[in-house]
Amino acid sequence: ATSGKVIRCRAAVAWAVGKPLSVEEVEVAPPKAGEVRIKIVATGICRTDDHVVKGCIANVEFPVIPGHEGAGIVESIGEGVTSVKPGDKVIPLCIPNCGECTFCLNPEASYCVKSHFSEPQNLMPDKTSRFTCKGKQIHHFMWVSTFAEYTVAPETAVAKIDSAAPLDKVCLLGCGFSTGYGAAINTAKVKPGSTCAVFGLGGVGLSVVMGCKVAGASRIIAIDINKDKFAKAKELGATDCINPQDFNKPIQEVVTEMTGHEVDYSFEVIGRADTMIAALASCNMNTGVFVMVGVAPSDAVISVDPLLLLTGRTHKGTLVGGSKGRNFIPRLVSSYLEKKFNSDLLITHTLPFAKVNEGFALLHAGKSIRTVLLF
């Protein structure tokens, strides 16, 4: 009944940098050719959404509807769309897969040339918006904008998932869980029997812990200044939990003493220059791999002692799991349904969408791992 028509619905709009999100009635236009309109059922609150509101993400334009960790049901499709149909369960992808660019055609690559990092995704590919509010054009965020009851995304940024998937649980697989789990499985390629160190135990850091465990790591050292996170980290597979504030020496020295020769893989899941360097220094020379997972502020700079790299360490970065989302996310959902991992353990709070700012307050206070908003 709604196909081809403008839909009026609720969305959380960031009108300006630093202002709390405002739940507004917005108009969502029908999808154009190659686009999909999705009824969002559930969306997680990710630290990156907080970075958007605070103005820390480069190239985002205001006013904007944030949110990029959602799951929903296809409401209608534009001309030429073949991979999904109305009624399909889907997860929108904050990094698309056009399937045609040099990166999409490279089996080793995972980030499409059409991602936000090479050309901003504040408007749809035709450079117009599908959102309006109070007569004003509202920008998209990474083509997904899941803080809206209905959103429009290009077909290339939509992954069809198993119809048995519970959307209020698998929404995390759109960003937070897949980012951490994939950093261990796809980017680092953690080997059985190896040692790992994970800096930062938020939702993504704990997902790294889960990925390291599934990959067969024999020792997983979890590091955070909030001891309240240690019980959950151990439940998910960490063998050791340490707080840098308990030591009067650099944390990389503590890790070296614990292991005797540094770790095989280290992950920084915070987004701070100092902890990135500490994590790099915590992995061993010759074969140590450091993976940068946390998103640093857009003006951050890291200064590295060249000797750390000259002696053989590898410094890698990863986004949303280091794999092509249209393939990886459906596979992850299948693994979830097969109970290969339990990402539900990351969900500490479930709130109605109207309480979106309460969800951000829980994040700021360090009281939540993941809050899921339900429409």
Curated annotation (Swiss-Prot):
Binding site for Zn(2+) 2: 98, 101, 104, 112
Single GO BP term: retinoic acid metabolic process
EC number, as in UniProt: 1.1.1.1
Protein name, as recorded: Alcohol dehydrogenase 1
Top-level taxon in the UniProt lineage: Eukaryota
Keywords carried by this UniProt record: Acetylation, Cytoplasm, Metal-binding, NAD, Oxidoreductase, Zinc
InterPro entries reported in the protein's UniProt record: ADH-like_C, ADH-like_N, ADH_Zn_CS, GroES-like_sf, NAD(P)-bd_dom_sf
UniProt record similarity statement: Belongs to the zinc-containing alcohol dehydrogenase family. Class-I subfamily.
Residues that coordinate or bind Zn(2+) 1: 46, 68, 175
GO molecular function terms noted in the UniProt entry: all-trans-retinol dehydrogenase (NAD+) activity; zinc ion binding
Residues binding NAD(+): 200-205, 224, 229, 293-295, 370
Record bears the keyword Cytoplasm: yes
Residues modified as N-acetylalanine: 1
Cofactor comment text: Binds 2 Zn(2+) ions per subunit.
Keyword Protease tagged: no
PANTHER family xref list: ALCOHOL DEHYDROGENASE (PTHR43880), ALCOHOL DEHYDROGENASE 6 (CLASS V) (PTHR43880:SF8)
Transmembrane segments: none
Names of required cofactors: Zn(2+)
Gene Ontology cellular-component terms listed: cytosol
Catalytic function, reaction form: a primary alcohol + NAD(+) = an aldehyde + NADH + H(+); a secondary alcohol + NAD(+) = a ketone + NADH + H(+)
A Pfam family reported for this protein in Swiss-Prot or TrEMBL: ADH_N
